[in-house]
From Swiss-Prot:
Assembly with partners or alone: Homodimer. Interacts with SSQ1. Interacts with BOL1.
InterPro entries: Glutaredoxin, GRX_PICOT-like, Monothiol_GRX-rel, Thioredoxin-like_sf
Alphabetical list of PANTHER family matching this protein: GLUTAREDOXIN FAMILY MEMBER, GLUTAREDOXIN-RELATED PROTEIN 5, MITOCHONDRIAL
Presequence range in chain numbering: 1-29
One Pfam family in the UniProt entry: Glutaredoxin
The protein's name: Monothiol glutaredoxin-5, mitochondrial
Binding site for glutathione: K52, R92, E93, G94, I95, K96, I104, C117, D118
Remaining remarks: Present with 6260 molecules/cell in log phase SD medium.
Main subcellular location of this protein, as a coarse class: mitochondrion
GO terms classed as biological process: [2Fe-2S] cluster assembly; [4Fe-4S] cluster assembly; cellular response to oxidative stress; intracellular iron ion homeostasis; iron-sulfur cluster assembly; response to osmotic stress
Sequence ranges assigned to domain Glutaredoxin in this UniProt record: 35-140
Keywords: 2Fe-2S, Iron, Iron-sulfur, Metal-binding, Mitochondrion, Redox-active center, Transit peptide
Length: 150
């Protein structure tokens, strides 16, 4: 008795196949210009956040929460850059494709994609975010923190 040959494309439901095809189809839209701009942005600072709005005026609750978490962790403003994806539709779609992450905000530390608001919140609760930011030397030096508190 012969077993039928396994065909991975046929074994998935039509909906999953359509989603997979759409994901690959969408990848064609990331131009080299946008890819280069994103790479340059990620390299601009040790901590980089792609968000809706600005740190002073976030335009969504998730961006506001992420900015709050980074502030509570003590991220040094001199080692932080934020990019407002609402100013550029190509950047907004491009960063999602670049990271293969569907939502904004998106956090990068030392050029490595960390995650969105849910991941950052979880990492903050567990202490992983503080450790990561400390390793990246992205926190305000303790002497400056003591001066601020006075």
């Amino acid at each position: 008795m012969f077993l039928p040959k396994f065909n991975p494309i046929r074994s998935f439901s039509p909906i999953l196949r359509a989603k997979t095809l759409l994901r690959y189809q969408n990848r064609m839209y990331l131009s080299t210009e946008i890819r280069k701009a994103i790479e340059d942005a990620i390299e601009s600072a040790p901590v980089v956040l792609f968000m809706k709005g600005t740190p002073e005026f976030p335009k969504c609750g998730f961006s506001r929460a992420t900015i709050g978490l980074l502030g509570n962790q003590g991220v040094d403003p001199a080692k932080f850059a934020a990019y407002n994806v609402l100013e550029d539709p190509e950047l907004r779609e491009g960063i999602k494709e670049f990271s293969e992450w569907p939502t904004i905000p998106q956090l990068y530390v030392n050029k490595e994609f960390i995650g969105g608001c849910d991941v950052i919140t979880s990492m903050a609760r567990s202490g992983e975010l503080a450790d990561l930011l400390e390793e990246a030397q992205a926190l305000v030096p303790e002497e400056e923190e003591e001066t601020k508190d006075r």
